[in-house]
A protein has these predicted regions:
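Intrinsically disordered, low-complexity segments enriched in small/polar residues
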Residues: 4-7, 95, 123-125
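Extracellular and analogous surface-interaction loops
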Residues: 28-32, 89, 132
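Active-site nucleophile-adjacent alpha helix/oxyanion-hole segment immediately C-terminal to the catalytic cysteine
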Residues: 1-53, 57-72
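Noncatalytic regulatory segments and standalone regulatory/sensor domains
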Residues: 113-132
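Conserved active-site-adjacent core of cysteine acyl-enzyme catalytic domains
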Residues: 47-103, 109-118
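Surface-exposed beta-strand edges and flanking loops
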Residues: 10, 101, 130-131
Length: 132
């Protein structure tokens, strides 16, 4: 069995026990190389434009689009399996991706995924990739 590509990532030094439920902010921090506060401020400003919370699907999509990300959905046709966070990351060794799983966001960057827990077995529903 091959090695997982998971790296623990917690940019919020106030969340000592990983209890804040701020995966949207953590994901943007890593994807955009921002501090937690800078990511929060940017996301708050952009979510105000559409008057939708930053971690709500529509609000988060608005933020990603405004930063140059493009969405790709993952089909779940009969007889097929969705890729997991770990399998997707192993196949995408370059680039920055925001991965969508059930009720959670994960950043995959240059062949590693970053989270406060090993979300590698989670099945993906889609992903956002930053167009350069």
């Amino acid at each position: 069995m091959s090695k997982r590509r998971y790296t623990y990532y917690q940019p919020n030094d106030k969340d000592l026990k990983d209890n804040y439920g701020d995966c949207a902010i953590r994901t943007i921090c890593k994807a955009e190389n921002l501090s937690w506060l800078d990511a929060y401020d940017m996301m708050y400003r952009l979510s105000r434009e559409v008057q939708c919370p930053m971690n709500c699907k529509y609000g988060f999509e608005h933020i990603l689009k405004s930063k140059g990300y493009v969405y790709t959905g993952i089909s779940n046709k009969k007889g097929t399996k969705r890729p997991t966070v770990d399998s997707f990351t192993k196949e995408h060794l370059e680039g920055t991706y925001v991965l969508i799983v059930a009720n959670h966001y994960v950043c995959s960057k240059d062949g590693h995924y970053f989270d406060i827990w090993d979300s590698g077995e989670c099945s993906m529903y889609g992903y956002w990739v930053k167009e350069e």
